[in-house]
Curated annotation (Swiss-Prot):
Pfam families according to UniProt: VAPB_antitox
Record key words, sorted: Toxin-antitoxin system
Lineage: superkingdom: Archaea
Key word Ribonucleoprotein present: no
Protein name per Swiss-Prot or TrEMBL: Putative antitoxin VapB15
Family under the similarity heading: Belongs to the UPF0330 family.
Function: Possibly the antitoxin component of a type II toxin-antitoxin (TA) system. Its cognate toxin is VapC15 (Potential).
NCBIfam families (alphabetical): PRK13696.1-1 (NF010249)
HAMAP family recorded: UPF0330 (MF_00794)
Protein source organism: Archaeoglobus fulgidus (strain ATCC 49558 / DSM 4304 / JCM 9628 / NBRC 100126 / VC-16)
């Protein structure tokens, strides 16, 4: 697989290092963090669930997001 060398600041390196999981390369980290995330509005009007069920789904999604971002 071809590679490319890049220069990043020490701060950027430290942040990337904090995101790195066991057994993961820095390339893996960059790919994982830059994967396209779907916008919730993309799903607007497509759910047939009740408002309460949708609210529950959104809250669970936020908890999952916080768990990954704040840990």
């Amino acid at each position: 697989m071809p590679t490319k060398t890049i220069t990043i600041t020490l701060e950027a390196y430290e942040r990337l290092k904090r995101e790195k999981r066991e057994g993961e390369s820095f390339s893996d980290v960059i790919i994982r963090l830059t994967e396209k995330r779907r916008d919730l509005l993309e799903f607007a009007g497509k759910w047939k669930d009740s408002g309460e069920e949708i609210e529950k789904i959104i809250l669970e999604g936020r908890k999952e997001f916080d768990k990954h971002v704040l840990s």
